[in-house]
From Swiss-Prot:
Record's keyword terms, sorted: Cytoplasm, Golgi apparatus, Lipid-binding, Membrane, Protein transport, Transport
Topology in membrane: Peripheral membrane protein
Name the record gives this protein: Sorting nexin-3
Binding site for a 1,2-diacyl-sn-glycero-3-phospho-(1D-myo-inositol-3-phosphate): R64, S66, K90, R95, R104
Keyword Cell inner membrane among record annotations: no
UniProt source species: Neurospora crassa (strain ATCC 24698 / 74-OR23-1A / CBS 708.71 / DSM 1257 / FGSC 987)
Record text about domains: The PX domain binds phosphatidylinositol 3-phosphate which is necessary for peripheral membrane localization.
Length: 142
């Protein structure tokens, strides 16, 4: 028996409402802290989602590049079947210039968008939701 296509009109909410499952991620607002050899830059991660594996519908946390390195290593160990994309490369000169910081911010955002967009990681990773949502995320707990 063949089923007929659904010909009813969609409501305004169905057309323009939030998608069934969505996850938006943004890396923004880099801030440089400290002086001299103790300087570092961290980045704000904004996450909006309705995926049940994530405890919060909206969250904002700050992470350093070194946190992203640990996070990526944990993902690789945790998810052997998934190829984890590379992070933007390390920078050794002018690493606190606006251009370098903006390039790194864009690279970290691209990395996170790929990672959070992967269905196996969205539902199977133990570290993903914590990294993008928990302000007290501890790299040593993994």
């Amino acid at each position: 028996m063949q089923s007929l296509p659904d010909t009813r009109q969609q409501s305004f909410d169905e057309i323009y409402g939030p998608p069934e499952n969505f996850l938006e991620i943004e890396v923004r607002n880099p801030r440089t802290h400290g002086i001299g050899r103790h300087m570092y830059t961290d980045y704000e991660i904004v996450c909006r989602t309705n995926i049940p594996a994530f405890k919060l519908r909206q969250s904002t946390v700050r992470r350093r590049y070194s946190d992203f390195e640990y996070f990526r290593d944990i993902l690789e160990r945790e998810s052997a079947r998934v190829t984890i994309p590379p992070l933007p490369g390390k920078v050794f000169t002018n690493r606190f210039s606006d251009d370098v910081i903006e390039g790194r911010r864009a690279g970290l955002e691209k990395f996170l968008k790929i990672v959070v967009g992967h269905p196996l990681l969205q539902t199977g990773s133990k570290v993903l939701a914590a990294f993008v949502q928990d302000p007290n995320w501890d790299r040593n707990a993994w």
